[in-house]
Amino acid sequence: RISTAEFHIPQSCLFTYDSTAKSKAEMGKNVYAGYLASAEVRSASEKKFERFCETCGAVDWVYKNGDKGAEYFSIVYIDSFGKQKSFFPDYIISVRGEIWIIETKGGFDRTGKSEDIDIFSPRKFEVLKNYLTKYGLRGGFVRWDDQSQELCICIEEYNENVKSEQWGLLRELVHKRGAEK
């Protein structure tokens, strides 16, 4: 049995920081005042996504979701054994007032080989896409592409191959959506 509950961004959140990181800049678009670029634990794709959001004029704000706990946003998916599991997308952002839900994954190396280690990515993509469609939201999976040195986004149909037409440049999609608003 799946239960649904209205989600609200928690009023406060505790973050740990890497005191040895060179960059300790405050990420001004994060919903939490004082959120630093050295927040831990985050993947390279998450750090690159946060930097993108921070410099993108179309992005209003960024919420870094937790990865477990009832206070965080999650969507249910079914694993290989038929068990219900909770999927916690990495980010909720606002692009010119429009809500997007984003999951970041391991990137692609220079040859286009996937560095995504999550075997449930295709299932998680489908439940995210269904959720976005049901609630009239935007979003998708975001991954770093070493060859183009760009963040890419997949929004329609999941494909492991970054060279496929399912992956587009995140900056182009965000700027296009921002210009339409």
Annotate each PLM feature.
Residues 1-181:
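Electrostatic, structured charged patches in enzyme active sites and in nucleic-acid/phosphate-binding
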